[in-house]
């Protein structure tokens, strides 16, 4: 679980992106996986993305950066995302 950077939905499949660069694809919905993961470590940032908040590196232009990739942060998910980050005392730097 700690090696998961983020998960991207693709219909009824999900792509699990790991810290070692591997990507796993499995037949499961993002919602089903979200229910199985600890809510204080994983947060929905967009209808198609679930991120490991411990791996967030920064924010720029409404997107967060994880593992060198820019992940969308939708308006409807911002409040929950920042709430979880505030409880974890995560300090984000602006990306240029």
Language-model region placement:
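Conserved binding/recognition cores within well-folded domains
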Residues: 1-73
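DNA major-groove recognition helices of helix-turn-helix
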Residues: 33, 80-81
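C-terminal structural segments of small proteins and small subunits
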Residues: 72-75, 79-80
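Short, charged, intrinsically disordered terminal tails
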Residues: 83-96
């Amino acid at each position: 679980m700690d090696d998961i950077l983020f998960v991207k939905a693709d219909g009824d499949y999900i792509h699990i992106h790991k810290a070692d660069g591997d990507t796993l694809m499995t037949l499961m919905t993002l919602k089903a996986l979200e229910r199985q993961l600890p809510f204080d470590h994983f947060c929905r940032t967009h209808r198609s993305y679930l991120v490991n908040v411990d791996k967030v590196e920064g924010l720029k232009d409404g997107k967060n950066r994880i593992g060198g990739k820019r992940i969308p942060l939708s308006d409807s998910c911002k409040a929950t995302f920042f709430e979880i980050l505030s409880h974890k005392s995560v300090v984000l730097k602006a990306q240029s």
